[in-house]
């Protein structure tokens, strides 16, 4: 009879060890991702025009030959994780291993329309990622956010006081907006009949510009912190307004909240939604709040999608925010005085929620 410990077979214990080690060293995944972005490897392969060998990559990077083996190790590991494809190519009667871009690494090609490299650079900067070393201290602080514990101030105050990281953050949000905009191009129903819209927390206007291009007769106001919009110039149907969404929101037929409410507590979200309700038109279907957020559904979503949503929920908890289930969204809408809502799928893990006053 096989021995057991705590009622578990050795094979089960070793599986547990493998899982434990996988997560102990999971930070290396993020650092290898940062490595390929910092070295512009996706751009190098893209510009190469075909799969690249390690020797070619080492030559372009101009790293010491003594590190060629390490480059190969990291490339092999990132290929295993889906960031590159390992292929065999024929060169001068010799077959060599080479690396090609995948759908994931194509999103890291700087200068392309859809590029998430700024998101990698912002999130994996020690300013943000280093804060997670304070999780234990944070969990015992009644009111402070994780970033409040780590940075010494509220995250939004920190951005105001640190222009360099503020730019990195805005660039990251703009890059993420491009992904959402890809989905919005095929999701016209939410904006039909709307003549004016306020993009609350709209940053530098990346999403608003796509909306204006798609609906040229729609007037769009980008509403954000004064320091974000103070030097930005509008167009005929796009304008910028600085202010505080907790005080008031500019009037329009509709209000857009894209990845805003997950930053805030339920009480803060109610306050934001109440101000948005005051701002939108009372004219039938035209007046509404359009929310782009995650909706957690552990029973229906695929395992990987659920994992992404739950990971983001932990991430947002560090701002005292959260990702929400449909029941949690519904509760917020009712408490903020809205009469109805509709949820439509938008991307793999985001939904478009229309909320009616």
From Swiss-Prot:
Catalytic activity: a 7-hydroxyisoflavone + S-adenosyl-L-methionine = a 7-methoxyisoflavone + S-adenosyl-L-homocysteine + H(+)
SUPFAM superfamilies named in the record: S-adenosyl-L-methionine-dependent methyltransferases, Winged helix' DNA-binding domain
Keywords: Methyltransferase, S-adenosyl-L-methionine, Transferase
One MF term in the entry's GO annotations: isoflavone 7-O-methyltransferase activity
Broadest EC class assigned to this enzyme: transferase
Pfam families in the record: Dimerisation, Methyltransf_2
Biological process according to GO: isoflavonoid biosynthetic process; methylation
Gene3D superfamilies listed in its UniProt record: Vaccinia Virus protein VP39, Winged helix-like DNA-binding domain superfamily/Winged helix DNA-binding domain
InterPro entries named in the record: COMT-like, O_MeTrfase_dom, Plant_O-MeTrfase_dimerisation, SAM-dependent_MTases_sf, WH-like_DNA-bd_sf, WH_DNA-bd_sf
Active site: 262 (proton acceptor)
Similarity field: Belongs to the class I-like SAM-binding methyltransferase superfamily. Cation-independent O-methyltransferase family. COMT subfamily.
Physiological role: 7-O-methyltransferase involved in the biosynthesis of isoformononetin. Can use daidzein as substrate, but not medicarpin or 2,7,4'-trihydroxyisoflavanone.
Protein name: Isoflavone 7-O-methyltransferase
Name of the gene encoding the protein in the UniProt record: D7OMT
